[in-house]
């Protein structure tokens, strides 16, 4: 499966915008206004090889009832919100066979931020033509393997 970089960029921009608005609404001092974007390759038994993108903010977090409904069409907590951003993000990620989730961050019982993360599976097939051919003894030899997969 190919990843559409424009669509993934759209998801990241939406999550970053939401994080910035959360920090703004929390009226935090400048020293606590942080947003972290991380991109980490991972491998899990459940998901296999994937890339995890995460956006973490130090805003007020999300109430449970918002987390339960935030992907619904036209659901918004913002007075001027259309309620399509997170639903669109989820559709984009799922169209790439990925998953998206949100979680509050805690310091003891207090919510100290929110983290949105999504994963996109990575499929790196190894073309047979890139392997060194076996010689008559069954050894692979000492040649150099070349990746002959076509790139767009």
Where are these regions (language model features)?
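A residue-level detector for a conserved hydrophobic packing site
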Residues: 8-9
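Short helix N-cap motif at coil->helix boundaries in the Bergerat
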Residues: 61-69
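Conserved micro-motifs of the catalytic ATP-binding
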Residues: 3, 28, 77
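ATP-lid-like helix-loop hinge signature
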Residues: 20-49, 105-110
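Conserved glycine-rich
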Residues: 98, 102-105
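Detector for a conserved hydrophobic position within an alpha-helical segment of the HATPase_c
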Residues: 93-94
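Conserved polar catalytic motif of the HATPase_c/GHKL fold
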Residues: 13-21
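Acidic ATP/Mg2+-coordinating residue in the GHKL
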Residues: 57
